[in-house]
Amino acid sequence: MNKIIILIALSLFSSSIWAGTSAHALSQQGYTQTRYPIVLVHGLFGFDTLAGMDYFHGIPQSLTRDGAQVYVAQVSATNSSERRGEQLLAQVESLLAVTGAKKVNLIGHSHGGPTIRYVASVRPDLVASVTSIGGVHKGSAVADLVRGVIPSGSVSEQVAVGLTQGLVALIDLLSGGKAHPQDPLASLAALTTEGSLKFNQYYPEGVPTSACGEGAYQVNGVRYYSWSGAATVTNILDPSDVAMGLIGLVFNEPNDGLVATCSTHLGKVIRDDYRMNHLDEINGLLGIHSLFETDPVTLYRQHANRLKQAGL
């Protein structure tokens, strides 16, 4: 009798687990299904897929699994925000022509932030939303330092450009993508405080007018969102954290290792204090991140659902 009771209990317990799991699976169906396709845009030295490793590690797959249409753009790894923006615009136009969609939801990381802003500014009719993650909207102290240390027109600048071009050529080779024109000095200029503020004069949509506030939530029919991390060393198992920690010393304010928190603000600031560094924001280095913070992939899923709830 005791054995029968145990078997019945186990059966009921197993059934409840299966039912709970099934219910969870069903509840996730369509969770990320936005009205318009999502386009992910990489930052400086970025790529779509490099030697089998995604720039947005595991993110497109997770979003697609529960209903989203996701496309990963590939623009110049190094170039001005405007040049990268024109490349992205051409890809957006092609995507809309193929899919029949009317608009896209643009999500950009790092230099991808200004890049997607450019597209939304010149063709707001094609963009439903702009989401910047760790975006450089008021410059980076790192870019300022590099520009200040390497004199314009110097031999050291020529050497640095040569090394950068070699790295970018390797990225193009390993990513198997289109060989976009590269201009390391243009990208450096774009990411300095001076370059960013100049860009903002021409493309001001969503940029906060205060030092560390929020920008307009909606401009020309386009919704603007942003979020970022505010930590440098987040997991001792991640070797890239050493670099993030050292580079982060350049700042005298909260930062993610490459960009100051206040510089990442655009439109509606979802959060700017995640325990994530610049690479964690894209689930970088194969997903190694802080054990005491939300999984980066979850943030993208939640945001896709946010866009869905907004009818985007």
Curated annotation (Swiss-Prot):
Gene Ontology terms: cellular component: extracellular region
Induction statement: During infection.
Gene3D superfamilies according to UniProt: alpha/beta hydrolase
Signal peptide from the UniProt entry: 1-25
Pfam families: Abhydrolase_1
GO-annotated biological processes: lipid catabolic process
Its EC number(s): 3.1.1.3
Annotated keywords: Calcium, Disulfide bond, Hydrolase, Lipid degradation, Lipid metabolism, Metal-binding, Secreted, Signal
Keyword Disulfide bond: yes
Residue ranges of every copy of the AB hydrolase-1 domain listed in the record: 37-228
Subcellular location as annotated: Secreted
Family per similarity comment: Belongs to the AB hydrolase superfamily. Pseudomonas lipase family.
Protein name: Triacylglycerol lipase
